[in-house]
Amino acid sequence: MHKYRTHNCNELKISDVGAEVKLSGWVHRRRDHGNLVFVDLRDHYGITQIVFTDQNPQLMDDASRLRYESVVTVIGKVVARSEETINNTLPTGHIEVLAGEFIVESAADTLPFVINTEKDAPEDSRLKHRFLDLRREKLHNNIMLRSQIISYIRQLMTARGFTEFQTPILTASSPEGARDFLVPSRLHPGKFYALPQAPQQFKQLLMVSGFDRYFQIAPCFRDEDARADRSPGEFYQLDIEMSFVTQEDIFSTIEPVMYELFTKFTDKKVSEAPFIRIPYNESMLKYGSDKPDLRNPIVIADVTEIFRDSDFTIFRENIKKGSIVRAIPAPYAAAQPRSFFDKMIEFAISEGAGGLGYIQFSETGEAKGPVAKFLSTQQLEDLKATANISNGDAVFFASDKKDKAAKLAGKVRIKLADELDLLEKDCFKFCWITDFPFYELNEETGKIDFSHNPFSMPQGGLEALENAKTTEELLELTAYQYDIVCNGIELSSGAVRNHKPEIMYKAFAIAGYSEEEVDKRFGGMIRAFKFGAPPHGGIAPGIDRIVMLLAEATNIREIIAFPLNQQAEDLLMNAPNYVEDKALKELNVMLSPSARKNAEKE
């Protein structure tokens, strides 16, 4: 007989009755019934009920003192449960093991929180004792689901002719849009490596190297603030790059991967290929967001022209100053109480708006509300037609400069869906957002900057860049850049790459980079492009966000084994921490006075 187990704790069936077995695991639950002690023994696979009887008083007494989460090995005989004690919720629920002896392999101290229920515990305590937290059923299952998803992704990609690569972790800093994690070089004083924000340049260089289809389950590092769907330190993505492809080639490759992946791990309805394509400007108009949740049936409409010559002075004057008006329908909401409309106004004010106008259309078509009296009968009819409003609906209005009005309308759309319970249930709705602006105005400097990935190919190529003379014309340029969105969550950005040095130099020059600076920062890639670079493109869906969706988790830390907390701290390993002066000296690093003072306190 094996030293620790002949079976796992999810394996024994009624056919095993009479067998002598050995099981090892954790004490999940213990129940003392006087002449009987029951112990639920748990391992990675499941739970088996162990019975200690008064036929062996010493053994039963020892079992009654077992602490939860102690590790024990039990030897005993499999017996059938009586009819009234069968537990059909457990695979082992038709049997139990009558204990003959047991060994405490490792006794547990008093637990900081309960393991055998999903009762919530303070997150800091959970993260500090993550090895305990990971024993809880939901979290344990999430980590197993993550493993299964990644394994299946590898199968899907390999079946489609992709080759898996590993790219460097120590590399140079690059402008992916977030702060780098920097690593000082001991051998090159004053110089620093950066942990990769993404394997962007390396995967493009692999295409230039003659490889055709690349993928990697890639670790990425960005010094960002935490959000519910974003870890503050590292994350993983399904990094993909392909040679000799158009944007549609990339879409048609990724869509079946997403469809097969989601249908494998959920019973919910999943969008079938081809996924809906929505240009960026259309998405901002209809949904007030570049990551729309298509489970929400509300479609926003532009009604600026209806209010341009109306008697509603506030909107009319706003329009004269260059603002717009967006209408956000609220289906079947006309009969809602006044408190509902007041709540929506308070929400808009909390989002920075001055208020939120609205109209209610009764079942008979009568228009009521603070805005209705300022519109003529014809204008009201035009409003209903433009915004697809029916009798019994209400409609809210957002008026501001284009970007602000669009964003407010988008937030109101989401709030209405929540308040009115409009989201379609049990489905995953995918879409592509395409034709992103190539440039944007930097809010801090007021200068032209890249809106997303600087390595994207501008639509129209070099000619489009050269013909755009004014700021307005530059801001109208679009890129072969796209996002894939599911249920309002951006899973990934991607792009057809700029593989021509002359276009890259011009694109960076418009954003204020000299040719020398481009060569300095991206010399390896620019040099490679001068030796024959294939047209190529790619995408990188986020593994963490995919797992979040499939696990129905609301927080990204629930699908990562050892996450950082919201302050980017690892409470289990006490990281980040201060290091000895000797190590700093070897790295030629000197702490600032304030950092030195903090270090001396530790």
Swiss-Prot record:
- Identify the stretch(es) annotated as Aspartate: 200-203
Q: Which CDD domains match?
A: AspRS_core, EcAspRS_like_N
PROSITE patterns reported for this sequence: AA_TRNA_LIGASE_II
EC number, as in UniProt: 6.1.1.23
Q: Which InterPro entries match?
A: Aa-tRNA-synt_II (IPR004364), aa-tRNA-synth_II (IPR006195), aa-tRNA-synth_II/BPL/LPL (IPR045864), Asp-tRNA-ligase_1 (IPR004524), Asp-tRNA-ligase_1_N (IPR047089), Asp/Asn-tRNA-synth_IIb (IPR002312), AspRS_core (IPR047090), GAD-like_sf (IPR004115)
Q: Which residues bind L-aspartate?
A: E176, R222, H452, R497
- Record: residues binding ATP: R222, D223, E224, E490, G542, I543, D544, R545
Can you tell me which family this protein belongs to?
Answer: Belongs to the class-II aminoacyl-tRNA synthetase family. Type 1 subfamily.
Which protein is depicted? Aspartate--tRNA(Asp/Asn) ligase
Q: Which organism is it from?
A: Rickettsia bellii (strain OSU 85-389)
Gene name per UniProt: aspS
